[in-house]
Amino acid sequence: KFPQLTEPNASYHGISFVQAAGPAAFATYIRAILLRDTGAAISPFNAFLLLQGVETLSLRVDRHVENTLKVLEYLKTVPQVESISHPSLSTDPEQQRLYKTYFPNGAGSIFTFDIKGGEKEAKAFIDALEIFSLLANVADVKSLVIHPKTTTHSQLSEQEFNEQKIFDNTIRLSIGTENINDIIADLEQGFDAVKALNA
């Protein structure tokens, strides 16, 4: 049934992994053959870096959430913002209950908002940002911005755009760990560019 385990393997001294390792045949095959052939293991230094990152993850997440909540409060005061989509802002009682139950410390740093206007205004806003990087990644330590309709979701149909609430004026932000005053100043710079565009 599993010839790679039961039959002699010419590339590994002609052994049968079932005969040589018994119940550990599959694990031995993975280590002796697949790991050797594909290199599917990180180097010791990469393992060290991964561990370093995991050890400080909770601190970074706290900062992401703290910054995000402050950005949301700021965006609620901006006249050029048409709407904001973040779990903490839902007015639905059931969604609020779920938010408080499952995200007592905040629901992360990724959300969208709709700027007044259309694609031209959205792109002017994005182009004016300096701290935010124009990238499709999410949850990076640095703040990120993207126009979903023309990038990450561009393959969708108009019906799918409407179902997903992705419009010409939708902007996705991923709030990073930078100083909150710098983040908000950068967003203000974006809104100033939109004002200048429509002046």
Describe each model-derived feature in a short phrase:
Residues K1-G108, D114-K142:
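Active-site C-terminal subdomain of aminotransferase-like
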Residues S109-D114, I171-I175:
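Short cationic amphipathic helices and targeting signals
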Residues D127-A128, S143-A199:
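PLP-dependent enzyme catalytic core of the Aspartate aminotransferase-like
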